[in-house]
Regions:
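Short solvent-exposed coil/turn linkers within tandem alpha-helical repeat scaffolds
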Residues: 70-76, 106-113, 142-152
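Acidic, proline-/serine-/threonine-rich low-complexity intrinsically disordered segments
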Residues: 1-47, 51-52
Length: 162
């Protein structure tokens, strides 16, 4: 798919790639209070993702929050957090979206979703007319994750909002 022009980019959150969004399913923890069911875990995540893809954002948020409550140690937890933030963005609730994307960065600092989450943080800051914070977030993203697609988009957005 073609990328939108840089000016149009500024109003869009990072578009996740479907393979990265799905990710691997976590293995059950042998020492946990109860054995996780990998199939149930996958169904829970995929069900919430299907709601998001169907533009049922409020239901998707509930589904992803339930997923995080049920499977807090899942390898998909960061992705679920990402989709919660993205869903709030789709609902134009930029403050809540911002908080959830920042939570992803703080809670899952080593997740491959961090660069996209930072791009979404900046996108929400732009929507909230906090250009100074958006510039700082974009600069930090480029500096900390320079080889990522999100950093390349961040550099274009940074040039567009200077």
């Amino acid at each position: 798919a073609a990328k939108p022009a840089p000016a149009a980019d500024a109003a869009q959150p990072a578009a996740p790639d479907s393979q990265a969004a799905a990710g691997p399913v976590a293995k059950p923890a042998a020492d946990g209070p109860a054995q996780a069911d990998p199939l149930a875990e996958s169904r829970s995540y995929e069900g919430a993702l299907a709601l998001f893809r169907g533009a049922k954002y409020t239901d998707a948020i509930a589904g992803f929050k339930n997923f995080l409550k049920t499977y807090p140690a899942s390898t998909l937890a960061a992705n679920a957090q990402y989709w919660i933030g993205y869903s709030y963005y789709a609902l134009k609730d930029y403050k809540t979206s911002l908080a959830h994307q920042q939570k992803l960065v703080a809670t899952y600092p080593d997740s491959p979703k961090v660069p996209d989450a930072l791009l979404n943080v900046a996108t929400n800051q732009i929507e909230l007319d906090d250009m100074a914070a958006a510039r700082k977030t974009l600069k930090d993203l480029v500096a900390k994750h320079p080889s990522t697609p999100a950093a390349k988009l961040a550099a274009r957005r940074l040039a567009a909002i200077k």
